[in-house]
Amino acid sequence: MLVGNSWTRSLEPVSGHEHTEVDVPALPHRKTEVDVDVSLRLRTTSGPGLPVPASLHYGADDPYAIHAVFRGGDTDVEWVFARDLLREGLSAPAGAGDVQVQPCSDSPDGRPRVLLRLSSPDGNAELEADESDVRRFLRRADALVPPGRETRHLDLDELIARLVS
């Protein structure tokens, strides 16, 4: 039971010993999610493109995935893709499916940018993001769950229960 800033834990009596209670300091709350707002630019055939407000979300409970939420119009649109895909796309073209990421060398402002290509049955979109925003997001996500340690954050019992239910 949490009491103040410590846990009180009742211990069962062991033969020859009395019932005791032990105070254990409460662990500080550990952040398990990363959210970063990013300004994207939707590429168009003419002009500088259209601004698209978005956010990137990463959670330790889904350690392989990034959730990109694009805000605009009447509803938000969410795409989920691999964190490794975003990381690999910073230095070379990555992805062969609905989401592709690559460095952007033809940005009108000349700043390092990342191109995100999204394809669905409803249409395609090319979005540019500042490389610095993407790197900042990945640094924070990697600090939360270092690359290669994702399996330590998976609840396999819960996953199996969802698969069989």
From Swiss-Prot:
Family listed: Belongs to the SsgA family.
Region annotation (Disordered) ranges: 1-21
GO biological process: division septum assembly; sporulation resulting in formation of a cellular spore
Cellular component GO terms held in the UniProt record: cell septum
The name this protein goes by in its record: Sporulation-specific cell division protein SsgB
Organism, scientific name: Kineococcus radiotolerans (strain ATCC BAA-149 / DSM 14245 / SRS30216)
Subunit text: Interacts with SsgA. Interacts with FtsZ (via N-terminus).
Gene label: ssgB
Record-linked Gene3D superfamilies: Sporulation-specific cell division protein SsgB
Residues of the signal peptide: none
